[in-house]
Design a protein with these regions (language model features):
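Acidic, polar-rich low-complexity tracts and alpha-helical solenoid repeat scaffolds
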Residues: 1-363
Length: 363
């Protein structure tokens, strides 16, 4: 009905309003090209009018929805209509177009549009948003390396509304990819931007584990000292840092410096670090020639019910060694045999070690 009226009454005072309504109708029917043509006729027929202004807004929205912001500005210039063609306006509309595509779920097209925005406006007002959306496109497309690159770029920018989410995702991706130095950097930065003590504790743990995974003892010792000084590092990070420090000291022949750390950790044998620490204290005590004290420590360790059977078994092997050192072959053999008969799994070296001790007793 509207289209017929428009075609038959080009000089009617209602021509322009009808044409504008027709443009809106086409838009609602999902025919943006026909809608744009109607709006352009409105601008041409009644330049400078309120109706033309509204039509120009419609034209702009159609171009933006199509991701063709440059097309809109080219039309406006050609039509001779007034509009804001400043860099700021172009920046805003270009991002709006890219964002609209991103929100539509068209990941592949959104990626291209967002990259175009970032390329054309390297210092754009929406750089943070564009980088965040782009990283999400990469994640949805399972493009891990590209996601890491984009997230790293966003993480390097001043703190913004995306910082915590960006660093959380970046730390996880780099850690899973074995990129330990990058993961450590992301986790450490994450500690400084998250809001709760639990979140900071998790970040501190991730930070220390990533540094330690890098295999550099000097870096691990430095990270351990840093973690132990962080107010919200949490018990897990603190414990793992202390244990790593003790282990590095022991490996470096500094047993006297490592022992106090092992003693402190051995108070809680429910953890893997605590269980091994208890054994290391036993080992050091036995190595120092005090078999009686070592025996007492072994029984105390066993009574605590540690779930870490490996280190409990190692302690019992040490107990068998104490008996053997006293020439009590019967007790020594019984201790070793109890491990052979009752320990599992059978392939981690413990059973083989106990059997070797039994064979040694036969000689």
């Amino acid at each position: 009905m509207l289209s017929k009226f428009v075609e038959e009454n080009p000089h009617s005072p209602f021509f322009t309003p009808a044409l504008s309504e027709l443009g809106l109708a086409y838009l609602n029917l999902g025919q943006p090209e026909l809608s744009r043509r109607c709006y352009e006729r409105v601008v041409e027929s009644a330049p400078g009018s309120a109706t033309a202004r509204d039509a120009l807004q419609g034209i702009r929205e159609i171009y933006v929805a199509d991701g063709n912001v440059d097309g809109y500005f080219a039309y406006a210039e050609k039509a001779g209509v007034e509009c804001d063609t400043s860099v700021m306006a172009r920046d805003s509309l270009s991002f709006a177009a890219a964002r609209r595509i991103y929100l539509s779920g068209d990941t592949a097209t959104a990626e291209k549009s967002l990259r175009s925005y970032l390329r054309n406006y390297p210092k754009g007002y929406y750089t943070d948003d564009a980088l965040f959306y782009l990283s999400d496109c990469h994640l949805k497309a399972k493009q891990t390396d590209a996601a890491i690159e984009t997230l790293s770029e966003l993480a390097a920018r001043p703190t913004n509304q995306y910082s915590a989410r960006t660093l959380g995702t970046l730390s996880k991706l780099t850690s899973e990819a074995g990129r330990h130095a990058e993961a450590a950097k992301a986790y450490r930065a994450l500690y400084d931007v998250v809001q709760t003590a639990d979140e900071r504790a998790a970040a501190a743990t991730g930070y220390f584990r990533s540094v330690e995974a890098g295999g550099d003892d000097a870096a691990t010792l430095a990270a351990a000292a840093e973690v132990e000084a962080l107010p919200d590092a949490g018990t897990t990070a603190q414990r793992e840092a202390k244990f790593a420090r003790a282990t590095i000291l022991r490996r470096g022949g500094k047993q006297a410096e490592a022992l106090p750390l092992y003693r402190e950790l051995s108070r809680e044998v429910k953890t893997a670090e605590g269980a091994e620490s208890a054994y290391r204290v036993i080992e050091a005590t036995l190595g120092g020639g005090d078999a009686a004290a070592a025996e007492t420590l072994i029984f105390a360790f066993a009574e605590k019910g540690s779930p870490h059977a490996y280190w409990v078994a190692k302690a019992y092997i040490a107990l068998g060694d104490i008996y053997a050192g006293r020439d009590d072959s019967f007790q020594a053999r019984a201790t070793y045999q109890s491990i052979v008969d009752g320990y599992a799994p059978a392939d981690d070296g413990i059973v083989a070690e106990a059997k070797a001790r039994i064979e040694k007793l036969k000689k």
